[in-house]
């Protein structure tokens, strides 16, 4: 769970060849450490304006001509979240489908998202939870 192997992330983004992301990809290639990955992830999610629009345009164009489950997921998410830079997340994070009765454990500080279905999350108290 969490992030895909860095080599896989580099492969996805290198194949997309998005000019607006090339600097981030080059930096990740040069620094394939958790810090390098965090810098890549935050840099990508911080894109704004024309850079963001151009990067998403290339991603969605590729998704429309690539018949792979991962790109089909990106197109499905785009219907719900048009223009969201998070559409790149499936290329960086492992996509896991749980069946009824399945469970998984996530270490602290592991990025994750629930895309559809119903789930129960059990966690300890933390300082980033609002209680009423």
Report each predicted region and the residues it spans:
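Long, charge-rich alpha-helical interaction segments
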Residues: 13-80
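C-terminal, non-catalytic macromolecule-binding modules
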Residues: 118-132
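Active-site microenvironments in enzyme catalytic cores
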Residues: 1-13
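Conserved AWS/pre-SET-to-SET junction and N-terminal core of the SET lysine methyltransferase domain
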Residues: 72-100
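Generic, ordered loop/turn and secondary-structure boundary motif
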Residues: 4, 92-94, 115, 130-131
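Short helix-capping and hinge/turn segments at secondary-structure transitions, especially at repeat
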Residues: 79, 106-109, 127-128
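Conserved metal-binding segment of the jelly-roll/cupin
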Residues: 1, 97-115
């Amino acid at each position: 769970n969490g992030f895909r192997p860095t080599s896989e992330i580099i492969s996805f983004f290198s194949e997309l060849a998005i000019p607006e992301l090339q600097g981030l990809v080059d930096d990740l290639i040069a620094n394939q450490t958790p810090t390098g990955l965090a810098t890549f992830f935050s840099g990508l999610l911080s894109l704004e304006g024309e850079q963001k629009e151009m990067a998403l345009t290339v991603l969605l164009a590729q998704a429309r001509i690539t018949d792979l489950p991962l790109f089909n997921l990106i197109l499905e998410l785009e219907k719900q979240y048009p223009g969201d830079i998070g559409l790149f997340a499936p290329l960086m994070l492992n996509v896991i489908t749980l069946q009824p009765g399945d469970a998984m454990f996530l270490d602290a500080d592991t990025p994750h998202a629930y895309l559809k279905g119903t789930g129960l999350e059990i966690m300890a108290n933390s300082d980033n939870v609002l209680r009423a």
